Amino acid sequence: MLDAFSRVVVNSDAKAAYVGGSDLQALKKFIADGNKRLDSVNAIVSNASCIVSDAVSGMICENPGLIAPGGNCYTNRRMAACLRDGEIILRYVSYALLAGDPSVLEDRCLNGLKETYIALGVPTNSSVRAVSIMKASAVAFITNTASQRKMATADGDCSALASEVASYCDRVAAAIS
C-alpha cells in the first residue's frame, strides 16, 4: 500500500532524483486539501451503514429474485454476508480516499474478489449495481447533496474528492464484472 507521500518517494528513488517539481506541487496540494479529504472520509464513514443498506435494498428492489428461495440474499445469513461485503468494500474505498491512492483497495480488497464471487455463485451484475448505488450515495454525502442529511463540510469545492471516490467505486465495479 502506498500513500501519496510514499508514491512520490518511490518514483523519485526509481529515477535517482530528489523530490521536486510537479511531485512536490502535488504533495503541497494534497496537504492543502487535507481537511476536505478528512471531511470526505468522515462523510462516508459516518453514513456507511446507510450507504450500504440503501445499496443492497436498491439492488434487491431491482432484482426481487435475490430474496426469493434460492436467491443469493435469501436467508438472514446470506443477507448478512451481502451487507458485510458492502461494508468491507466501502471501508477500503474510504481507506483509498484517505491515502489518496488506490493501491490499498486493489491489494487488499479487489485482488481475487471476482473469482471469489464466481466460486460462491454471487451474481456479479447485482453486485456491480450495488456498488454503483454506493458510489452515488458516497458522492452525494461528500458533496453534501444527500437529501436526508446535511453535514458541516470544509470550505471549498469537494468535487475532485467526489470524483476520486467515484473512480475508486468504478475500479470495484470493473474488478467484479
UniProtKB/Swiss-Prot annotation:
It is a peripheral membrane protein. (2R,3E)-phycoerythrobilin 2 binds at residue 158. GO terms for cellular component: chloroplast thylakoid membrane; phycobilisome. InterPro entries: Globin-like_sf, Phycobilisome_asu/bsu, Phycobilisome_asu/bsu_sf. Phycourobilin binds at residues 50, 61. The keyword Membrane applies. The modification N4-methylasparagine is found at residue 72. It is found in: Plastid, Chloroplast thylakoid membrane. Contains two covalently linked phycoerythrobilin chromophores and one covalently linked phycourobilin chromophore. (2R,3E)-phycoerythrobilin 1 binds at residue 82. It comes from the Eukaryota. GO terms for biological process: photosynthesis. The keyword Membrane applies. Keywords: Antenna complex, Bile pigment, Chloroplast, Chromophore, Electron transport, Membrane, Methylation, Photosynthesis, Phycobilisome, Plastid, Thylakoid, Transport. Belongs to the phycobiliprotein family. PANTHER family: C-PHYCOCYANIN BETA SUBUNIT, PHYCOBILISOME 32.1 KDA LINKER POLYPEPTIDE, PHYCOCYANIN-ASSOCIATED, ROD 2-RELATED. Heterodimer of an alpha and a beta chain. Light-harvesting photosynthetic bile pigment-protein from the phycobiliprotein complex. This is R-phycoerythrin beta chain. It comes from Porphyra purpurea (Red seaweed). The gene is cpeB.
